[in-house]
């Protein structure tokens, strides 16, 4: 038991300088992109089993590194994502006077989270429009898939699954790799 506690303390101590840099990514005085990239690469392959800090908190993406990029970039998109303990999630994106809110369910297995997007809510200048069913093969998505068609070979329309592989999470910052291979830093959204 004591050995496990010492190992945990050693891991946390080793990660703390990198986590400190990642915490600053969402501040008014962020680190340089090179410093943030180095910290992200140092922390991305760590092992963590407690994902409780992710739940019931709104997160906003602030920094991202593509798989083959030498350096990451700070994100300017106004977006927030929340994972609730009941297995539901929302992902909100703001663009000028528009707000898109994707809602659905997720399954967390180990460090992998699979998202199933079910509804899209749109607000124009704060006025809500009717919710749209965007489940695969249902509603408007079925129409788009039938018009768009599929790949040769009769497999139908195929898309990359919505999967995050979580790398790190504490009360103020989390790191996840998406199905595209890009890795992002998310910070707790204020308010």
Feature roles, as predicted:
Residues 1-16:
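N-terminal chloroplast transit peptides
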Residues 16-191:
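Soluble ligand-binding/transfer domains with enclosed cavities or grooves
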């Amino acid at each position: 038991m004591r050995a496990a506690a010492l190992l945990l303390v050693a891991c946390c101590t080793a990660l703390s300088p990198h986590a400190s840099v990642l915490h600053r990514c969402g501040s008014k005085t962020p680190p340089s992109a090179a410093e943030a990239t180095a910290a992200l690469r140092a922390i991305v392959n760590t092992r963590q089993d407690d994902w409780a800090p992710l739940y019931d908190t709104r997160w906003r993406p602030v920094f991202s590194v593509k798989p083959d990029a030498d350096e990451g970039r700070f994100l300017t998109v106004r977006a927030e994502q929340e994972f609730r303990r009941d297995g539901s999630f929302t992902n909100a994106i703001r663009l000028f006077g528009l707000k898109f809110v994707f809602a659905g369910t997720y399954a967390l297995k180990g460090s992998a989270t699979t998202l199933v997007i079910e509804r899209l809510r749109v607000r124009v200048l704060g006025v809500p429009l009717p919710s749209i069913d965007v489940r695969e093969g249902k509603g408007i998505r079925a129409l788009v898939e039938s018009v768009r068609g599929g790949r040769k070979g009769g497999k139908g329309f195929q898309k990359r699954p919505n999967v995050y592989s979580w790398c790190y999470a504490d009360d103020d910052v989390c790191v996840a790799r998406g199905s595209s291979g890009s890795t992002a830093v998310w910070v707790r959204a204020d308010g």
